[in-house]
Each structure stands twice: as C-alpha cells, then as structure tokens.
Amino acid sequence: NTPSTVRPNWTDPEVIVVRYGTRQTTKSECYYNFRAYREPDAEMTMDYFFWIFRSAEQTIVIDTGFSPEAAIARKRQPVVAPADALARLGIDPKDVKLLVLTHAHYDHAGNLGLYPNANIVMSRKEFEFWGTDMGKRPQYGHHIDPLDIERIQALHREGRITLLDAPQNTLIPGIELYELGGHTPGQMAVVVEMPEGPVILASDAIHYYDELEQDRPFAVLDSLADMYRGYERIREWLQRPGAVVIPGHDPDVMNRFAPVDASDPSFAVRIDAHGAGV
C-alpha cells in the first residue's frame, strides 16, 4: 500500500524533530555484521529524537524519549529533557490528547507519565511481544526499560492504549501509521501528508540515512528480512513528489531541515508549508 495523496486542509501544519540526547559510537556497533563490508571502523554520532505534529487544530506527539533514569543508567548524554523541550515549544503535555508509540524501546517509550490525558496508539504485535518470555531474553530485553513496559501495560488496563492490528492504519485523516517490523516486531513508521509532500517519520525502521542509501541494516533487529522490506517500502514512498524521510537517530537530520530556533540550531528542526528543509 502507498500513503494516501489526499492532503487535509490543516491550518499552519508543521512537523517538529526534537533532538533530546546524543552519544558517540562506532560503525561496528551500529551496523549489523559490519565486518562483512570489509571497511575500516570509524566513530559515529548517534542522536536521539522524538517528533511532534502540530497544526492550529491539533498537537500529536510521536514517541516520548528516554527517561532521566535511563540516561544515567545507560550513560547517554541528555541534550534537553523532553518536558523542557515541550515547554520551549509552547506545548503543555497535559493538553496532548493523542500520542503514538512507534515501538517500545527505552529511548522511545520513557516519560509516558508526562501525558496524563493522552490516548496512546501502538501496534498490538509490539505491545504483546514485550509481555512474552521471548521479550525478556537478554538480546531483546537489553533494549527496553522494564518500568516502561510496566507503565504501558498499566495504561492498557486503564483503557488508554489503542492497539492496532492492521499493517496500515489512519491515525487522523492525513497521517498514516505503517507497521514495518524489522527493528522490533511491531515497529511503525508515520507518514504525514504535508502541503509540500509526505514527511516520512521512519523512527527506527531506519536509524541512519546510510541504511537506506547503502542497504546497510542496523545492528539491533528482530527480523533482518523485514528490515530490508521496510527499506523497500520507504524507498517507494520517497518516489512521491516532495517526499522527505526522517531517520530515527541520524545527526544529519539537524543539517537537512530548518531550525525551530535559529539561536539554538541543535535543539529542534521543523518541516512546514514554507519548505521541506534548507
């Protein structure tokens, strides 16, 4: 399936990418079976993002970042606390009514307590997997925070989580959710029909632009075949006029799009009706 080409009549729509954390790593740590490429290893930067769709009508938050406790435990370098980032953008998390969890890894599903009034949308496959014994195996469990999973399960019991069964779902007219898998069993990508063309929020279906451009899978995966298929889907979407893709962790995102605050260009970038980037 391809994303809908029907573009809603939103007032002043924008997609905001918030850079809330960073760390230094290496190619051999980031890319699956890196030695197969017969290249020298090299240092890389991994940035951590969450995303916001905002118009005059609605604000939707996509993923929630890692918690302060997780940052300390995993030696990640916070750039801005997600709560402070929202405040800088003029967003009160209590006013957020709709929140998407693309997957349940610690760096995407912390801080859910910031959003007491949000209905949370995620893949049923993703939700159910992390409640299984397999999800607790070390190679899977390393990437989640058990406290996040407990909170997600509690929110589901409270009726605040909507679980999606279909591979494609309309979040609201103009925003489609696609279950691509690969990185995790229910990894989702979000496609926003902006006036200039679709904005593909790949989340961790791709971490870096290199994955798409060099067909180079990330090291953390549930299904290698599904990861490759996800790349193929995203490449198809990129054939559409004006389409842009936002990977889940590539610092180059901050160079490709216009800063929200010119005095602090490392804080956040935006894609809006004035152009897809710089």
List the predicted regions and their residue ranges.
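Cap/insert and terminal regions of metallo-dependent hydrolase folds
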Residues: A73-R76, D84, A189-V278
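Core dinuclear metal-dependent hydrolase active-site scaffold
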Residues: N9, V17-Y20, W51-R54, I60, ...
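Histidine-centered catalytic micro-motifs
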Residues: L99-A109, E179-Q187, I246-D252
